[in-house]
């Protein structure tokens, strides 16, 4: 076993780098004291959400309200002194300060009334902010303060009143803020600070993209969030592939957006040019019967003119047939995928207008394929090649999309482990016997955690491998497999029956059989085995998304004897009727783990104008027998390692192996 001095000598290169940040014994010792103090603070609050599906307004409101936590803080501070209506207004102000502030100011009859309102509001916000900041060090709160007004806010939040009058002191500062025309700015900054401090860490367990109107808004918000991680969903990886320039992924995401009349997001938000696709679609399919290609529409986002619907439907058909051709090509390139039964263009009887699905022949609902050569059905004609080239170029050159996908790669992964919780979107593929399913890729067998790790690594190839390389092509094909493959941990179903739903009337062909995982995860022993596979004790939790919990039918989100929590509660509007709710947030604080069940959100406009909040029901899953401290978390382990390194640095200074570059007045 090495002695302390031997360990320090071996680490001198690293310690010399550390000395750049702590150039003296005093600086290092001061940081040791601060870090050790952090270890004794309560653990920060973590929020877990999944399956946002582009529903930006509901997500923004839940993020702004911290899933109801902020309203709880308002009631704790003001419940005994302020009427319900005023508390609701104040909560809305915190959620939407820029939108709500002008409304509240307009109600003030004159300058004197406005000044009175300013004073009351600032003092109330300060009290609420002091409560939400109570778990944080003063240094941490200072770091969150805006530079323009940080000193004053720090004074308001942390002033002591042993020797002077609190009301007089606050009154003087607040009066000066109002007198100098800074009240609006301070109100907005306090609201933002309250939201910032209410939640320490945000976990998004997959599917930011899908049919919802503005996934780009969600990603913009997440990119500004102080601490977030993402576990990719199958809707996310196919967009990652599209951004990488994968033709099959591009066609897939466009097919989804067009089928829900959401291509405006693609064109206006990401700047993707669909003009060439529309021109080609009109040329070949403009006179077809487009009944089955009409998009699903949301009356809340209408109205839709016949011309709008036709444009969408004709592009929907064109991109779908292009997608079917490319699917066959990807399946041919990747026999490891074992998806040969999905090459439907080779299974069509062109003379009879039928298709073979699952060994049976079915009539097709649409038999117009003007761009398909029956002798070579997967070949692209010259027009399709041009359109595809333009689309790939447009996706690759979309600056905003590239920023979003780089963020997904930087903050995302197939699974994540933190503070005893295992997070993943879809499934750990299993057999009917309850063992981990084994699949072979590139000549090697993978199952359980090894399969998840392999999927993560190969997904990154698709974006980061050198341009034109076989590894990049392979990675992009695999991103598509993660979207819909039978043993994809992100999909977890036997097949994605897009073709059958469009072309075959018989509903029995539309079934997507769930992976056996979704039966076995009800068994506590299986959940414990999954946790053990990932190196976690049986007391840990699995946080899962992907499959909406049908609460209206009595289904519970708690599985496996409490070891697994499904947090897909149907954020997406289309699932509200199916689930009976509008999403979950799992909240893990220093005292409890609780699940908040959200009711449907009407609109941000109503929230601002009528102080309408999302109604949420809180269900305590576990109560800790003591308040969890930072030292008991993964962050605590990191901080202890930091303290160890800093102590080694101090010793290296004392031994003279590293020279101090600054002399501080200190006792060290």
Predicted feature residues:
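Feature recognizes metal-dependent phosphohydrolase scaffolds
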Residues: 1-668
